[in-house]
Amino acid sequence: MIFSTSNIKKSFTTGEVSEEILKGVDLTLAEGEITALVGSSGSGKSTLLTIAAGLQTPSSGEIHFDGQDLGALSPEKARQIRAESFGFVFQSSHLVPFLTAEEQLLLMLETAGSPLSTKQQRQEVEKILDEVGMGHRKSAYPASMSGGEKQRIAIARAIVHQPKILFADEPTASLDSTKSREVMELLQKLTKTLNIATLMVTHEEDLLTYADRVLTMKDGRLA
């Protein structure tokens, strides 16, 4: 397994009240597979995803990626690994409003520290935009895009640096059923063809057919 968590716990304290959100979660992700996390609101599924992605720190437990304990690394080294090897897609596309589709992806390559030349970066961006069906919109700004188009660009941005892990938190929440299926078909195709390990949180049961594994969170644990 390329990615795993071991006994992840997370508590939040408000005043004198402490609430344990995650109660010792063991999770594994495999390349070329979509793992879907489901559960009721407040079950801890989004908290688990953000901790796995390094966007939150656990109260205790270990996160292993590609044979390394991320918690044992320096913060700088852990950030570098996340920038190079992790991709993120969220409910909202979070596109930069004043950048074109092409520029969104070029910025991602720069952020990830891509070793490619400027020419190679543009070629890679063009290839990925074509892959997600948005090559004809490379000069478009977010304001002129539909919700489905924005999410396709967000997915392209998340994979342009060839990450090994993709974290997707409710990636279809803002889309209608038709666009949701299109986005899931795209995620499924990219997960397989690029051999990415994808972890997805969703509340839409009809989309679970696109997942290779479905895990249920209940009361801070994997049921």
Each predicted region: which residue ranges?
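C-terminal segments of enzyme domains that contribute to small-molecule binding surfaces
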Residues: 223
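ABC family nucleotide-binding domain
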Residues: 2-3, 8-25, 29-210, 214-217
